[in-house]
C-alpha cells in the first residue's frame, strides 16, 4: 500500500534500516523537495549521476550541509556503463552495522560525476518507447 514519507521512514527504522532521501530536489523523479528537511531521514543523496544541469545535486548538498544531514552519492544506474559514476566514500569496515552507523554519523562523503549523456539519452528514448505502446485490455 502507498505510505506517507513518515510512515515509510518509520517502517525502515523498525526494520533496522537507514532512511535515505534519494534525489530529493529532482522534481521530475518525484523528489520530496523541502519536505525532506522536516523528515527523520538518516542521510540525503547529494550526488546523483543522472542529471542534466546539476541543480538538484546543488540544492541537495546545500540543504544537507545546512541541516547537518549526512550525505551519500549514488549512480542510480539504469545501464551497466553507468555503475560507479557516483559513489559514497565510507571508512573501511567488515561490519554492515558499523557501515550503517558511519553513514548515520555523517562519516560518508559523496563523490562522482555525471552519467555520460549518451546513456541518459538512451534511457529517455527507452522510457519514451514504453509510454507510447498501446495499453493491452
Regions found by a protein language model. Give the residues of each.
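Charged catalytic cores and adjacent phosphate/nucleic-acid-binding surfaces used
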Residues: 6-10, 18, 27-137
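A general structural motif
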Residues: 1, 24-29
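Acidic beta-strand-to-loop metal/phosphate-binding motif
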Residues: 20-22
Amino acid at each position: 500500500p502507498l505510505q506517507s514519507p513518515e510512515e515509510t521512514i518509520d517502517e525502515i527504522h523498525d526494520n533496522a534500516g537507514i532512511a535515505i532521501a534519494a534525489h530529493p530536489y529532482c522534481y521530475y523523479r518525484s523528489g520530496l523537495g523541502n519536505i525532506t528537511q522536516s523528515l527523520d531521514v538518516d542521510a540525503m543523496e547529494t550526488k546523483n549521476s543522472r542529471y542534466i544541469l546539476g541543480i538538484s545535486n546543488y540544492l541537495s548538498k546545500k540543504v544537507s550541509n545546512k541541516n547537518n544531514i549526512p550525505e551519500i552519492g549514488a549512480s542510480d544506474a539504469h545501464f551497466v556503463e553507468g555503475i560507479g559514476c557516483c559513489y559514497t566514500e565510507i571508512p573501511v569496515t567488515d561490519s554492515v552495522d558499523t557501515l550503517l552507523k558511519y553513514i548515520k554519523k555523517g562519516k560518508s562523503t559523496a563523490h562522482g560525476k555525471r552519467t555520460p549523456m549518451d546513456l541518459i539519452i538512451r534511457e529517455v528514448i527507452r522510457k519514451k518507447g514504453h509510454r507510447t505502446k498501446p495499453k493491452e485490455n
